[in-house]
Amino acid sequence: FNPRLEFSISLLYAFSTSSFAYSSTGLNIVPGPFVILLSFYFYKKFDLQNKSIDIILCSMTMGFSLLLRNDFIIFSLMTSFFLIYLFLKRKQKIKNFLFLFIPILFYGMIIFQINSIEFGSPFLSEYTNKNGIDIISSNFPIYEGIVGLLFSPGAGLFIFSPILLLIFISFFDFYKIDKQSVILVLSFMITIIFFYGSLSTWHGFVSWGARYLVPLTPFLLLMISASLSTRKNKLFYLLISSLAIIGFFINLLWQIQDVSWFVWGPFGGNTGLFSLGIAGLHPLNLNPLVFWTFEYSQLIKAMILAFTNFQPDMYLFKVWGIVPSSVVLVSVLAILSFKLKSLLKLQ
């Protein structure tokens, strides 16, 4: 790997995936991927250098990730299993086990204390007497959730982040470089997809794309980095550039306008995509058409809105107007791009 490759992958993650859309929100899936990616970094560092400090840092970041989201325990468990596998093959097994589990236990005590204060019991992470939709049901077909998470027109991962389609090629390229990491990422990917695919709310309500799979995105881009470093033909670079531009445009639609209001409309109202839902028939007033057809997909509706009745949702657009704001924005991006290009040349 080299600085140019690392910079390219960072740009792809920042601007051509759903992470770009969510970057302007306060959702915990925004910092979450950074934390679990950091734990993966310390895991790989220990694998290569065999230093105890990396075990401690990996354990601490995994524990901290659980404070952000409970479902990050999936990645923490996967990484812990792989660390234990490394411990068993090396010396100082007991010391390594202590370095791994003591920080995790510390964060576990914090989580138990928070649960005790908030829910009255250290073993509860939510209220058990709440009413609402039953998100886990034996009547819900898991294959529907899995296909929906990946390919549905209204919320699919590969629809809203088309650059990730390259993983079907990149897994093989990365496997030749680092088999162990591929197995870890595949394990994480399969587990989280099956977990959220089993929920009737796999779509994340009115989220832009597969919100629950956003933490998986940087790991899939790591796979793509292997293809960038090994495949040098122009056709492949043209394919990557095209998918990146499409992904940027798709997620820019969400950034520049209020999709939640102008596309979905008020909950239970007579306008927007919510108006398609029938109370008592469609859970959460979400008609399946909004997820399974392009005609009623929020993506297509947002695209039509942008070109026919654009409602800017950016502060500068409202103050200066669209044209002056666009000129300033493009100028700033051009200057930053030039400076970054100069820095990369120095590398």
Q: How would you name each of these model-derived features?
A:
Residues 1-15, 33-34, 50-57:
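Transmembrane-helix signature of polytopic, membrane-embedded enzymes
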Residues 9-14, 54-69, 76-80, 105-106, ...:
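Membrane-interface alpha helices of multi-pass inner-membrane proteins
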Residues 21-31, 117, 156, 209:
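Short acidic/glycine- and proline-prone juxtamembrane loop motifs at membrane-interface regions
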Residues 81-85, 158-186, 220-227, 236-245, ...:
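Hydrophobic, aromatic-rich transmembrane alpha-helices
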Residues 96-170, 185-196, 246-265:
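Membrane-lumen/periplasm interface segments of specific transmembrane helices
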Residues 235-347:
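Transmembrane helical bundles and short interhelical boundary loops of multi-pass, membrane-embedded
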